Amino acid sequence: MAQKDNQKEMNDQLKVRREKMQFLKDEGIDPFGSRFERTHLAAALHEEFEAIEKDDLDVKNQEVTIAGRMMSKRGKGKVGFADIRDRSGKIQIYVRKDEVGEDNYKIFKKADLGDHLGITGQIMKTDMGELTVKATHLTFLSKALRPLPDKYHGLTNVEQIYRQRYLDLIANPESMDRFTKRSKIISAVREYLDTHDFTEVETPVLHGQAGGASARPFITHHNALDINLYLRIALELHLKRLIVGGMERVYEIGRVFRNEGIDTKHNPEFTMLETYAAYFDYKDVMDETEGIIRFAAHKVLGTGQISYQGQAIDLDSDFARVHMVDAIKAETGVDFWQPMTVESARELADQHHVKYEEYWQVGHIINAFFEEFVEDTLVQPTFIYGHPVEISPLAKKNAEDDRFTDRWELFMHGNEYANAFTELNDPIDQRERFEAQAKERENGNDEAEGIDEDYVEALEYGMPPTGGLGIGIDRLVMLLTDAASIRDVLLFPTMRPDKQENEEI
């Protein structure tokens, strides 16, 4: 019954708003406006005039022109107030019939919450000291035919927030702030890399072969060529071809696609930063990564001391650097430095209730121990390095112990934020790694990479020692905006089809 009443109320509101739209048309007013030039944004008005006393503002008699969405409206008779919001913030307007004229005042009286108005008037302060634009002329710019979400409670339905992000941005200023910060974070990352002599490039989204990461790809079909293509799962292999070509320092910020599950940390399409620098090794890339994250934090937040989900995170101090095997030993007492067979590793896994796949080697089990017992304990920024060779097909083997690679992952608050390594530049070793991955695929690992012959051929022309980095931009934005879910930092996250839409179809 309540649902039917709500629907009737909505239908009544839609009807009334359309009647008001028709009234505007009958009065010769375009309800959907045209170009409008303003002199100030709301924030600029506050910045310029907030400190000026009321009487001084009256003497100044400064005319301004603003535009925005009407978010609240109050008053009666011949006088009214409203709050106007633009992209920078909110400002109050004061409308008097004897100031704007009867015809112009009709526009204000007929305006609903959500409508866009243009206002010209004098900047003033009320007796309560609130900065206000006293209107001398109103221009109708756009009629909202649907009502906004409840002005007192905002938009709180999580599903609706994600499906109708435009309503979320209207109703929840903190969401607008989060996405504004996202843009600034990406700009800061670019600024840091540009000033360190990196060149931004663009590489193909459609690949003839999926590679550069262990993930299941999306497959599409090119009709003209009659071939299957893959949406990229990583940026890596094309960027390293550019290192072979002599570009030496390159980066790309772009969308990648992985045909996998959806949760608070994963979305099928997400934004990656990858950088490659000739003559770097994985330790140089640690320094680079600290610099990028610290610079972005200070640029956008003004500090390296942040809070994420109630936990203080220190981005100003040097990030810890711990070998994966040492981290496992510290938490469990299990010593994977000791040489061992697959059977011995499986026995240890059984004793510690760590699940494993039939095709796994010792290195896979080491990584499983890390994920099970260590990952969630890493609160402060920590580089975990020395990943097993079995799970690192594109990383260079460690010179002192070839069971491990010169690879690391960065963890904070139990989450991974970056992955990097000294790149494997030996084409013979690379082919052997690809072949091992192909064998894993045959044994049931559908995320294993195949053999990319063109990439191996590129390496045969000679790639200098290179340090490569991948940072998940979405997770970095989550960290710096204290967002609990990746969906909170994606304007339009992937969602299950809405039941109502399916029923209509």
UniProtKB/Swiss-Prot annotation:
Q: What is its main location?
A: cytoplasm
Q: Name one Pfam family in it.
A: tRNA_anti-codon
Catalysed reactions, as listed in the record: tRNA(Lys) + L-lysine + ATP = L-lysyl-tRNA(Lys) + AMP + diphosphate
Extract the InterPro entries matched here.
Aa-tRNA-synt_II (IPR004364), aa-tRNA-synth_II (IPR006195), aa-tRNA-synth_II/BPL/LPL (IPR045864), Lys-tRNA-ligase_II (IPR002313), Lys-tRNA-ligase_II_bac/euk (IPR034762), Lys-tRNA-ligase_II_N (IPR044136), Lys-tRNA-synth_II_C (IPR018149), NA-bd_OB-fold (IPR012340)
Question: Where's it found, cell-wise?
Answer: Cytoplasm
Its required cofactor(s), as named, are: Mg(2+)
Keyword annotations from UniProtKB, A to Z: Aminoacyl-tRNA synthetase, ATP-binding, Cytoplasm, Ligase, Magnesium, Metal-binding, Nucleotide-binding, Protein biosynthesis
Please name the CDD domains in this protein's record. Answer: LysRS_core, LysRS_N
A single Gene Ontology biological process assigned to it is: lysyl-tRNA aminoacylation
Does the entry feature the keyword Magnesium, yes or no? yes
Q: Tell me one GO molecular function of this protein.
A: catalytic activity, acting on a protein
Top-level class of the enzyme under EC nomenclature: ligase
> What superkingdom does the record give?
Bacteria
Annotated Gene Ontology cellular components are: cytosol
Binding locations of Mg(2+) 1: E409, E416
EC numbers listed for it are 6.1.1.6
What does the cofactor section's free text say about binding?
A: Binds 3 Mg(2+) ions per subunit.
Name the residues that bind Mg(2+) 2. Answer: E416
Q: How does it assemble?
A: Homodimer.
* HAMAP family tied to this protein: Lys_tRNA_synth_class2
* Stated family: Belongs to the class-II aminoacyl-tRNA synthetase family.
Q: What NCBIfam families does the entry give? A: lysS_bact, PRK00484.1
User: What is the protein's given name?
Assistant: Lysine--tRNA ligase
Originating gene: lysS
